[in-house]
């Protein structure tokens, strides 16, 4: 019930992950999305120094904006025009017809997570050459789709969902 009542934003990653393993919340986020809650995500440090492990500078958001002004950044954050990261860079993502596309820094895998359709998600793995882009074909019954990039060090980046 509490998850369904959340609105706006949720933290998908807190840097406390390095200290206690409780910083990644994609399962809760997916549950909220499956219930129809249109919420974005962010990654943060959640830094409480001093700690046993250095947990600063480990989570952030990258905003898609043509302008570097306070008003533009806030408007794009409110619109969900950003991705959250703990390492990988996502340079482009979106939907073109029935395909979801993503380009990124070299990755070990790209996960496309789709809502509303059993079996609608897909993982693309790096084999021989660096994995820097992925395409996922929509099947027609999805209500939303998002992507997750995992680099070779296990660090992740998450797009906000695109509602279909």
Enumerate the language-model features and the residues they cover.
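Single conserved hydrophobic/aromatic residue that forms the stacking wall/gate
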Residues: 1-13
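Charged catalytic cores and adjacent phosphate/nucleic-acid-binding surfaces used
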Residues: 11-164
């Amino acid at each position: 019930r509490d998850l369904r009542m959340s609105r706006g934003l949720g933290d998908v990653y807190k840097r406390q992950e390095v200290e206690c393993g409780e910083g990644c919340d994609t399962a809760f986020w997916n549950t909220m999305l499956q219930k129809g809650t249109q919420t974005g995500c962010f990654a943060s440090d959640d830094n409480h120094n001093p700690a046993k492990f250095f947990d600063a500078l480990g989570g952030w958001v990258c905003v898609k904006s043509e302008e570097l002004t306070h008003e533009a950044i806030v408007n794009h954050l409110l619109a969900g025009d950003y991705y959250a990261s703990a390492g990988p860079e996502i340079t482009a993502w979106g939907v073109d017809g029935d395909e979801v596309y993503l380009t990124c820094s070299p990755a070990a895998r790209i996960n496309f997570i789709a809502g509303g359709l059993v079996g609608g998600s897909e993982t693309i793995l790096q084999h021989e050459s660096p994995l820097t882009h992925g395409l996922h074909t929509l099947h027609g019954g999805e209500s939303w789709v998002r992507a997750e990039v995992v680099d070779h060090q296990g660090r992740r980046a998450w797009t906000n969902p695109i509602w279909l």
